Amino acid sequence: MPVISLAQMLESGVHFGHQARRWNPKMDPYIFTERNGVHIIDLVQTAQLMDEAYHYVRSASESGKKFLFVGTKRQAAGIIAQEAARCGGYYVNQRWLGGMLTNWTTIKTRIERLKDLERRYESGIFDLLPKQEASMLRRELDKLQKYLGGLKQMHKIPDVVVIIDIRREYNAVQECQKLGLPIVSLLDTNCDPDWVDIPIPANDDAIRSIKLIIGKLADAIYEGRHGQVSAETFEGDDIPSAIDFEDETPEPVAEVADAEVAAAEPVAEAAPTAEAAPEEAPAEDAAPTAEAEEPAAE
């Protein structure tokens, strides 16, 4: 039995790719067809590759490997924090700071600074300081919590990195490749599959698609660590997040009718209405150049 059924993927909009003009030709093997100018991902292959990813992640978790989730886009940030916390992983969901992995020594000192400030704040020391000094320390604490809060328990470089939107997280991909860390990633139709080790062809823009795939990977980590899937589940749109989810202006993509998708996919029983992939921000079109920077330094 597959880890995720075709019906679940159709309902979550996993099959919706980008407009055909935005595609990466290397994704051609994973594309089923084109409908109204939009590429439709082959869900049969997605199901097979999801099974492979699930078993790989579960096996790695059983052997004690540590996982880092990376997803800084608005649709993914809350899901990343939620699922990483549930399965005992680490996460970056605000901004990837240059050198987060390749300059781990510096990052580790900033994490220790974060822990020290938290201890001082909780003990009430901030209240005893001059108002201006206390205000500066609170701002520093807030900044460190924002960018490094998901790494507080990470004592060494992780063994496996799970990434949402490898084009947006290009710097993270580069650092993983430099260190030889395996990458598990959702691949939309505009991605380059050569960048990752464990590909999962899927819509990486729709919240429900991201939640479905990342939730299953978190299940695999939890199962590998504890021998069973966590009973803690999150239904619907109950996604805690440190930031607001604002609707982005969608790409002018034509809707694909349910009956049409069902006819195009012979193995699917029905095709419920799914979310269309929103247009990427223009800044994401070009892969940014990796830069070395000291994180969260005042």
From Swiss-Prot:
GO terms for biological process: translation. Residues 232-298 are annotated as: Disordered. GO terms for molecular function: structural constituent of ribosome. CDD domains: RPS2. The keyword Signal does not apply. GO terms for cellular component: cytosolic small ribosomal subunit. This is Small ribosomal subunit protein uS2. It comes from Acaryochloris marina (strain MBIC 11017).
